[in-house]
Each structure stands twice: as structure tokens, then as C-alpha cells.
Amino acid sequence: MKPARTDWDSYYARPYRTASLTRKYTASVLVDLLRNHGGVGAAILEFGGANSCFIEQILDEIAPARYDIVDNNQLGLDLLKCRYPRDQRVSVIRGDVLSMHEPERLYDIVFSVGLIEHFDPAGTARAVAAHFSYLRPGGTAIITFPTPTWLYRAVRGLAEATNNWIFHDERPLRLAEFESAIANLGRVESARILWPLILTQYCVVVRKFP
């Protein structure tokens, strides 16, 4: 019987085979968006960023005032702490996006990459809402999630058929579901499909309502 959930310990211990290729592209997209939405000198929060594969490029090219990471996987968080033991800008927090506490601070930018699709529809809506709970009025949310294009379906189907698919609880989303989740939270500023990822993802930028 196939596992019902993704084994994140195994993922962080041994990343998916194509990860290094797709991460470079995603990082370049994120850096451009952060630069264009006030990321320089900003307070940034990454949800689901255990052992973040984007933090190095963002710290180097965007130079935020602070970069906080929230995730519930201890192994991934420990790996990240080892990478940045003395950088005062970086804070690592163990937490669950579905049960976050009242925020101690609000951020200029909150983002996640490939997080909200790992829940049922109600959980996805809650995960999306958490981004905005930690975002200041007028701040920017950047959220990516897989979407079931013909290319995504073909590649995932092949991976599943050959027992190489590891994201067992991944639920590719259509843009309409995401738009419904943010309808009362903010305004979509841009939405595009990142085709070079092969396992295609939407990248959506949302401005929180004032």
C-alpha cells in the first residue's frame, strides 16, 4: 500500500532527484518578484521553508532586514540552523501553518513554495489564510503551488508508474480554488504558470487589502 503522506525527513535527508535543477529557476523567479515588491530591507517570512533552498540567494541579492522561516519538520530546521548559526537576520521557528499562534510581528512579504497543496481543500484554505495573518496591510504574499496541466499529469503519471513519486499527499490545484481562498484577503496582482519546472506550478502574487 502506498504511503498516505510525504516523508519529509527522507526528503530533506535526500532531496528529490530533479530538485537542484528546478530550484535554481524558482529562486530566480522569487528574487525578481521580491526585488519588484519591496523586498530589499524588508521583513520576510517563508512558510514551509525548512532547510530553505532559496534563502542563500535571497539574503545575497535582496538583503532583507530579517528572514524568518516557519516549518514543522525538525530535521529540516536543524539543517538550516547549521547553515546560518550566526546570521542575526535569520530566525528558525518550529510551527504548523494550520495551527499558527497570534503573530508577534507582521511581515512585509510572506511566501511559500509548494506548501498549500499538501492538504485537503479546507486545509489549503487555512494554510493560505495563515500567510495573510502574518502579513501587514498592503503587504505582499507570493505563493506557488502545482497545477494539473497536461505536462504535470504526464510527468507525475510516469513517476508514479515507476515508483519514483514521493509527494504522496500533493494535490495539484487550479487557480480558481486559490482565488476563492484569497477572495476576502487580498487582490491578485499577477499569476503565471512556471512551465520550466516541468511539474508545473502557478506562481501568484497577492497584495493584502489595507
Summary of predicted features, one role per range:
Residues 1-41, 45-101, 119-123, 142-210:
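Class I (Rossmann-like) S-adenosyl-L-methionine-dependent methyltransferase catalytic domain
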Residues 111:
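A conserved beta-strand element that flanks and buttresses the S-adenosyl-L-methionine
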Residues 114-118:
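Short catalytic micro-motifs in class I SAM-dependent methyltransferases
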Residues 125-137:
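A short glycine-rich, Lys/Arg-flanked "PGG" loop and its adjoining helix->strand segment in the class I
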